[in-house]
Each structure stands twice: as C-alpha cells, then as structure tokens.
Amino acid sequence: MHELLLFASVPAHQHHELLQQLAGLTAMQPRHRLERRLIFKAYRKPGLINTRVGASQDLQGNEMQRLNKMLNGGMFYTQVVGPVSEADFGAQSSAASSGDPDAPMSGTDTGTNFEYHPYSYENQPWKLEFRDIPEAGTRSAVTTRLMASASLPKGDITTPMNAWGYSFVTEYVVEGDVFILNDIVIYLHRVLHYPAESSGSHEPRRQLPPFQQMSPLEKTGSYVLQASIAVQDGGNQEMMKTASQHLFGLREQLKSAVRLEQADRLSLDTRAK
C-alpha cells in the first residue's frame, strides 16, 4: 500500500479558525484523537518473527504474515501507536493504586476534585505502523511512500519487539483532530513531549502524567496539517495520478488559509543508520 501526502504548518492563532473551515468543507465535526507513539529502532537484521514470543501468540496468522513482511525488509525506525484519552493522563492515583484502605474514594470530600480512573498499560491496544522513506525523483509534487500497519498484542510490547530485532528509543504523544473528505484523511495535529525526568527511561511509560504537564514540541504552539490518501495498489499509475489530483484539489480549496506542499524527503527518512 502507498500513501500520498501534502503538509502545511499552521500557526497557533490560526488553529481554531482552520478547524471551523475544515468542518464546513467536510460537513462533519472534528474527531479528536490522542495517541501514544513509541519509537523502536532495528538493532540487527530481523529474521522471521517467532510466533511463540510472548503475547504474539494471540495474533492471527494473516497479521503475523504482514508483520514478517514489514519487519524483514531492512533496518528501519518504526512506530507503535496506541489510542488514549485525556482521562488516561494523570489518572492513576498513587494512593489508590497502592491499595491503601485509607485512600480517598471517588466522591469523598478531601478538598480536591479526585476521581479514580486507572490507566491500564496491560490492556493498552497497539498497532505497528511502518513508513518507508519517501520515493525519490517523483515527478508529482506530492510525498509518496510505502506504508503498512498491523495489529499487535496488548500491554507490554517491548518483549516481542526486542525479539523481532527492535529496541525502544523514545515516545511522545500526538494530539489532533481528524476530518474525512471523500478519500482524503485530513489531520490537524501537534506533537506533545512528556515532562522531563531525572533519569532517562529505557522502556515505555506504564503511567501517564497529568495532561497539563505535557508540552508542545514546537515551542510556538504551531500545528501540522497533513492531508493523505492511501492507495492499495501503488503500481497502478492511474490510481496514483487520481489520488494526486484529489490532493491538488484540496490544496486549491485551502490556498487562502494554508499552503499545502510536499515534504522534504530526508526529513521523513525512517532508515536506521
């Protein structure tokens, strides 16, 4: 499967206005999206995935085949994505999670607004998203790259990823809103960093900090507008041309608000050096 994309930078002061414009253009309300994104790096040439590794036994045969195909093509950075909600951030109270019988229960008057909503890392769903480096020398003025995704076991994903030749590097959160216009997925989003820790962690977080402690990667608070189309058969030139034309049509519709353009190829290089 191939992905065709255009990107635009959106200043923070323009965010609300653009949301309204996209809602009118697509005749839909935005779908808010929060995602944990874990970055893994290949540290050796992967072999065939061992289907007996931990929770990977729970995967269906077709998912295992897709994972084998994705992870055996070379040495890349890849990301593991898990949906979360704002209620998951700061949800785990240390008192409530410790089993302390004197811990305040939801609804009791302790002088603070306390609500116990545990975030369960063990039940966190994940999917693996592979993105190749964008194709070079394409005549079309859009970013084109090979893409694939597959479901992964829930919970601690580091053990199977390590067994497949991938080590955990870092993680961040992406917050944004999604719109659909025919075959185009429009994603207005920003990257959020976790608060700094005294000691660097070499594994994904099992608990999430309060959402207010998350900070934008871009200090100015700007957002990224991404417009993408997935094409099942990247070898079908007619389908690829049609998808490009649809993106150009959206670019024309939004030209008074933002400048959608092709991304720098090397800025999206996922190869592990």
From Swiss-Prot:
GO cellular component, one term: mediator complex
Keyword Lyase: no
Ranges for region Disordered: 90-114
Location(s) in or outside the cell: Nucleus
InterPro entries, sorted: Mediator_Med18
Pfam families per the UniProt record, alphabetical: Med18
Keyword Transcription: yes
GO MF term (any one): transcription coregulator activity
PANTHER family cross-referenced by the UniProt entry: MEDIATOR OF RNA POLYMERASE II TRANSCRIPTION SUBUNIT 18, MEDIATOR OF RNA POLYMERASE II TRANSCRIPTION, SUBUNIT 18
Protein family: Belongs to the Mediator complex subunit 18 family.
The protein's name: Mediator of RNA polymerase II transcription subunit 18
Organism from which the protein derives: Aspergillus oryzae (strain ATCC 42149 / RIB 40) (Yellow koji mold)
